[in-house]
Amino acid sequence: MDEIYPAVGNELTMEVWQQQWQTFEQEGLDTLEKRRQQALALDIECQAEQILGSPGKIICQRAKQDNSDIIVVGHRGRWGLSEILLGSVGNYVFHHAHCCVFVVPTPD
């Protein structure tokens, strides 16, 4: 395969894609910082970081690495067939974590 075929009809340039990714990344960091500040206001010791990858796997790996006693994870209310088809971070963590998992329903 020595041939290269240009993609036509796609207005998404690398520059636009990078800008969109940076915006997405910054929104995630802003949300994390907001939640971290809320926890600190309640005297809850916490840290926040944004890691690229599968959330459930990363949470389980990080908890094991940090020798955590418990993982607290939110659940947005997908149950039954919807959860099976779409997946759930809380469900993955519940079934794969090395420690106790507390799944908290989050308000809509």
From Swiss-Prot:
Species, as recorded: Synechocystis sp. (strain ATCC 27184 / PCC 6803 / Kazusa)
InterPro entries: Rossmann-like_a/b/a_fold, Universal_stress_UspA, UspA
A Pfam family hit: Usp
CDD domains noted in UniProt: USP-like (cd00293)
Family named by the database record: Belongs to the universal stress protein A family.
PANTHER family referenced in this protein's UniProt entry, alphabetically: ADENINE NUCLEOTIDE ALPHA HYDROLASES-LIKE SUPERFAMILY PROTEIN, USPA DOMAIN-CONTAINING PROTEIN
Listed name of the protein: Universal stress protein Slr1101
Domain of life: Bacteria
